[in-house]
């Protein structure tokens, strides 16, 4: 029996079945193959929970209440945002906190019985190990680019925690990270404190691999650099603009983070659960996450201390260990007799036979941070490179918006940019821009959060405006205030949100630049001057963060224009609350207000994304929204057949043994479009449907006669560890166990499904660790991603004429689960075996911070 209403959509047509007056709807589900991996993809799953990424805070934050609450203390010039954290026999107190981020909404916990694999009783030292440890301090100066520490490696010499690391084979732990940075009210600057799971880093010399000594220095820090690192063997590419991983540094906010804005707070606190694709791991060779501290606004003071110390204090939580040992050294196929029955459509959704019947897959693991829909990621704030001048696009300065104090009138704009999230140089490489560039159309409201990073003594008012399309960008403040605008009074709440409402004559706008559906302009103006007392920096900075509102949707999936490939990559590698949402949110009618509630003011330092909607800042009408987020589900995003390998093999009297067959170790790293999509998530679990498109040609020669027989091809799948054939006519091809597909030319392309093969609980897109226990061998390589090997040959031993066949292997992941979203790759790929990269500009440049594309609106008469 089914639901009362059943709806099926195909293209622009909709079929509706409704049960009334006691009637029922009966469903028939035909599975032609008994194995779950053979089933077609799951398409209709609308469950979403963006809050684990947008609001991962310990204390519930109410939109209408101030994010930082200290009205009485603000009058005295001091904050009363006190917090005390006790773990073991150690306590930390602070009077300048900005809430606590609980990464992915998960508090650390011990391993559950139904998740465990090791059978020996675990060591759980509790208070002897789970206490605060303080690492070596670093000095923040005006030219500092940033620092990183890798965990648990940074604690290897810290008390009993380090001893247990050495004397146990396996371990796991969560962590409380507390980063402290004390400065006076006359200092200014802003730090991003972020925890990056599986921060696999690239080498400064792309054709080499990094050394362990350059990846981590124990409790001492490793430093980022403002520009590209020297191309030396074993060195990490430390250019801060690409965050050591080939991504835009402004998109690191997809990970658990807080900001230390010296005018607002002096510490950041992040609680990290254990994150991995297996229940436990060797703590010496695998760095589960990396703590990065990056100055987005430089430290500035006038006559005071020229540097400020930054101290990291970290406490393991729920630590447990296993494997005590010696210490280590340092039925038939469906038939459709209709046109199209023998074609291969890369987006089809049919069943295919399973290559491994009765296969017993490993059970899923409860990994924090599961993603169901790309809009969950689009709703997370990321930093916008508003200051993308040519000199800045390869530095952190691209994110710094200068505002300065002055003794005279300031009629000029602070900044302007075109609201073009798909193709505009300012927004296209944010998290929002990267995601919508996988689609042709977008619709919905956009949040822009501005963070003032001047000293606590600086005051002033700014006007931030959205000017709808139809005219040129505003030339004066008078022009700007005619549009949707907000006047921001700088105060304790460091951040102000401009919610750009959806104002359009069409349901969607084009992602590609299009004047008919252009979205308008954003500009900022001095409402009053910025005022500072003596001995206080007069040059201040702002940051801008962008994200989607809950009415945002996309459609018409396509390839992104941000990654290209000319040749195959080389280099071999050695539960949160869910809500079922089928439509985006409606716009609720709102009227004028005069209230002490300030939803537009917030504090980005807390690490949460504001939940402001258009009705909080403008009067709105009720709009019934029928757009859905079905196309942005993870299943739909990844469930398209993509070419992952191309190879040639020959038949004929002159063909050598090596040329008579193809051997390919299955991976998705050679061709960049699918690789980039998969690398937007740290861990993936899926079955894969493999389709083989084989074409043959008769080789050129002096004989002009054509005598091409109908060729039969054999595709053999060998599981990991299976015997490998070295000849095209070996008896290994006459296997009794390895599954083979025999295909004769002229038929529909052969296809098989391969279930989830890994010995772990998920495939790892990145692995910040080593293949050997001694931190030697291959960096970034483990065996969890082994999926087996494919062999292809001609069954015909000889042919009258030399024949060359080309096989194209198409992958379609299905039954997909994804965890821990990541910033999309910015830098071009170099090799398939690592993440090495050349330093790449954050985005395209423009002439000045107020330069916008000029559009002519003259009436054409010709």
UniProtKB/Swiss-Prot annotation:
The keyword Transmembrane does not apply. One of its GO terms (biological process) is symbiont-mediated suppression of host gene expression. It comes from the Viruses. Keywords: Autocatalytic cleavage, Capsid protein, Eukaryotic host gene expression shutoff by virus, Eukaryotic host translation shutoff by virus, Host cytoplasm, Host gene expression shutoff by virus, Host-virus interaction, Lipoprotein, Magnesium, Myristate, Pore-mediated penetration of viral genome into host cell, Viral attachment to host cell, Viral penetration into host cytoplasm, Virion, Virus entry into host cell. A lipid is attached at residue 2 (N-myristoyl glycine). The record marks 69-70, 331-332 as: Cleavage. One of its GO terms (molecular function) is structural molecule activity. GO terms for cellular component: host cell cytoplasm; viral capsid. Belongs to the picornaviruses polyprotein family. This is Genome polyprotein. It comes from Echovirus 16 (strain Harrington). The lineage of its organism: Viruses, Riboviria, Orthornavirae, Pisuviricota, Pisoniviricetes.
């Amino acid at each position: 029996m089914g639901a009362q209403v059943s709806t099926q959509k195909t293209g622009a047509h909709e079929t509706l079945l409704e049960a009334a007056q006691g009637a029922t709807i009966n469903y028939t589900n035909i599975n032609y193959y008994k194995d779950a991996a053979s089933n077609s993809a799951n398409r209709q799953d609308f469950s979403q929970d963006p809050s684990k990424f947008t609001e991962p805070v310990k204390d519930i934050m109410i939109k209408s209440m101030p994010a930082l609450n200290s009205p009485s203390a603000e009058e005295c010039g001091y904050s009363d945002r006190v917090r005390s954290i006790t773990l073991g026999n150690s306590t930390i107190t602070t009077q300048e906190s900005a809430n606590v981020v609980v990464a992915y909404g998960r508090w650390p916990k011990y391993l559950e019985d139904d998740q465990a694999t090791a059978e020996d009783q675990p060591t759980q030292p509790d208070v002897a190990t789970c206490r605060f440890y303080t690492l070596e301090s670093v000095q923040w100066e005006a030219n500092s680019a940033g620092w990183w520490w890798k965990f648990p490696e940074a604690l290897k010499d810290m008390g009993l925690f380090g001893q247990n690391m050495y004397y146990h084979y396996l371990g796991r732990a969560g962590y409380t990270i507390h980063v402290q940075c004390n400065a006076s009210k006359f200092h200014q600057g802003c730090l991003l404190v972020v925890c990056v799971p599986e921060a696999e880093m690239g080498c400064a010399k792309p054709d080499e691999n990094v050394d362990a000594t350059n990846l981590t220095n124990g409790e001492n820090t490793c430093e980022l650099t403002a520009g590209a690192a020297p191309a030396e063997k074993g060195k990490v590419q430390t250019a801060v603009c690409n965050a050591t991983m080939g991504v835009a540094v402004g998109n690191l906010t997809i990970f658990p983070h807080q900001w230390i804005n010296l005018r607002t707070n002096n510490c950041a606190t992040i609680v990290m659960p254990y994150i991995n694709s297996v229940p436990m791991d060797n703590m010496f060779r695998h760095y589960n996450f990396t703590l990065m501290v990056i100055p987005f606004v430089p430290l500035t003071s006038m006559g005071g201390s020229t540097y400020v110390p930054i101290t990291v204090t970290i406490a393991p939580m729920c630590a447990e260990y296993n494997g005590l040992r010696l210490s280590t050294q340092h039925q038939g196929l469906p038939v459709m007799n209709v046109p199209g029955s023998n074609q291969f459509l890369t987006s089809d959704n049919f069943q295919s036979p399973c290559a491994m019947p009765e296969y017993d897959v490993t059970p899923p693991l409860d990994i924090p941070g599961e993603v169901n829909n790309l809009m969950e990621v689009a709703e997370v704030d990321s930093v916008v490179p508003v200051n993308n001048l040519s000199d800045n696009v390869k530095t952190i300065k691209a994110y710094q918006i200068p505002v300065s104090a002055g003794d005279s009138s300031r009629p000029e704009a602070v900044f302007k940019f075109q609201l073009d999230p798909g193709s505009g140089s300012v927004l296209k490489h944010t998290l929002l821009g990267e995601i919508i560039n996988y689609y042709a159309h977008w619709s919905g409201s956009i949040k822009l959060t501005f963070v003032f990073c001047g000293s606590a003594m600086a005051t002033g008012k700014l006007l931030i405006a959205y000017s709808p399309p139809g005219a040129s960008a505003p030339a004066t403040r008078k022009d700007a205030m005619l549009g949707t605008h907000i006047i921001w009074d700088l105060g304790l709440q460091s951040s102000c949100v401009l919610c750009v409402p959806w104002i359009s004559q069409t349901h969607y706008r084009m992602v590609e630049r299009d004047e008919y559906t252009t979205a308008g302009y954003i500009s900022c103006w001095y409402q009053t001057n910025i005022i500072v007392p003596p001995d206080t920096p007069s040059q201040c900075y702002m940051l801008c963060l962008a994200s989607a509102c809950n009415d945002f949707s996309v459609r018409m999936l396509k390839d992104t224009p941000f990654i290209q490939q000319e040749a195959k990559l080389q280099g071999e590698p050695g539960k949160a609350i869910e809500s079922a949402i089928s439509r985006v949110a409606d716009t609720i009618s709102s009227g004028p207000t005069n209230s002490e509630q300030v939803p537009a003011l917030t504090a980005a330092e807390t690490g949460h994304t504001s939940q402001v909607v258009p009705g909080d800042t403008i009067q709105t009408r009720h709009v019934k929204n029928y757009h859905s987020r079905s196309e942005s589900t993870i299943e739909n995003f990844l469930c398209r057949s993509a070419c992952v390998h191309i190879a040639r093999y020959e038949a004929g009297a002159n063909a050598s043994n090596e040329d008579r067959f193809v051997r390919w170790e299955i991976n998705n790293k050679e061709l960049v479009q699918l690789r980039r999509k998969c690398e937007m998530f740290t861990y993936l679990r899926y079955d894969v449907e493999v389709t083989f498109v084989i074409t043959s040609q008769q080789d050129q020669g002096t004989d002009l006669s054509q005598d091409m027989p109908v060729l039969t091809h054999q595709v053999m799948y060998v599981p990991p560890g299976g015997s490998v054939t070295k000849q095209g006519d070996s008896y290994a091809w006459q296997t009794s166990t390895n599954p083979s597909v025999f295909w004769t030319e002229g038929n529909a392309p052969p296809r098989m499904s391969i279930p989830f093969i890994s010995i772990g609980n998920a495939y790892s897109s990145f692995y910040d660790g080593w293949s050997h226990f001694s931190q030697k061998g291959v960096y970034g390589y483990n065996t969890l991603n082994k999926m087996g090997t494919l062999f292809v040959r001609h069954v015909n031993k000889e042919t009258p004429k030399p024949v060359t066949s080309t096989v194209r292997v198409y992958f379609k992941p299905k039954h997909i689960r994804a965890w821990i979203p990541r910033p999309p790759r910015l830098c071009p790929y170099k090799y398939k075996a690592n993440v090495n990269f050349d330093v790449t500009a954050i985005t395209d440049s423009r002439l000045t911070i107020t330069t916008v594309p000029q559009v002519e609106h003259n009436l054409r008469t010709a």
